[in-house]
């Protein structure tokens, strides 16, 4: 009885639309054919700055390259791998990461991140990534990206602010 009474006084739940929204068209279909193919590679090399260390956020921690900055280099390498092959006006954005940070490197170390496109379907891309310093692999994994149109992407991002 209590349950029925509560159910009657509860506010109605908003109903979901009967039809799912239409899947957006791949950018390639909108802006011409893409030249993307497995095997495209990109890389970036940078010297580790103090601002990129975990110690820059908490001085009690070691002055070594932070995981987010290592991943950022991997993301840039992935974006550069396909930049010249994207449809005009398109960009790629990160959607998911699966990365292991294997070794620490100090300020002043040179880090090279490499990315290789291994899968693509429509606007979705998968890269194998690796970061190294000298002969040491310091991180490896997978980066997932999507091809988007910048104006629509930015408008959608702004629509989520309150």
Regions inferred by a protein language model and the residue ranges of each:
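Polybasic, lysine-enriched low-complexity intrinsically disordered terminal tails
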Residues: 1-29
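Generic structural detector for well-ordered beta-strands
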Residues: 45-49, 100, 142-144
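Hydrophobic beta-strand-centered segment that forms part of the acyl-chain substrate-binding groove
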Residues: 79-112
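Catalytic strand-loop segment that frames the active site of acyl-thioester-processing enzymes
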Residues: 30-66
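Conserved N-terminal beta-strand and adjoining loop/helix that marks the start
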Residues: 67-71
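HotDog/MaoC-like acyl-thioester-processing domains
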Residues: 106-107, 116-162
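Short, residue-level hotspots on alpha-helical faces of the histone-fold
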Residues: 72-76, 80
């Amino acid at each position: 009885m209590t349950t029925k009474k509560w159910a009657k006084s509860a506010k109605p739940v908003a109903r979901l639309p009967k039809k799912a929204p239409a899947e957006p068209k791949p950018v390639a279909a909108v802006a011409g054919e893409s030249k993307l193919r497995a095997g495209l590679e990109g890389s970036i090399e940078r010297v580790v700055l103090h601002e990129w260390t975990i110690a820059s956020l908490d001085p009690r921690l070691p002055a070594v390259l932070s995981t987010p900055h290592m991943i950022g280099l991997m993301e840039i390498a992935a974006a550069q791998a396909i930049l010249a092959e994207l449809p005009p006006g398109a960009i790629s954005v990160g959607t998911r990461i699966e990365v292991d940070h294997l070794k620490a490197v100090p300020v002043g170390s040179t880090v090279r991140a490499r990315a290789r496109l291994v899968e693509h379907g429509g606007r979705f891309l998968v890269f194998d990534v690796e970061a190294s310093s000298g002969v040491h692999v310091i991180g490896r994994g997978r980066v997932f990206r999507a091809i988007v149109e910048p104006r629509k992407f930015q408008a959608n991002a702004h629509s989520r602010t309150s």
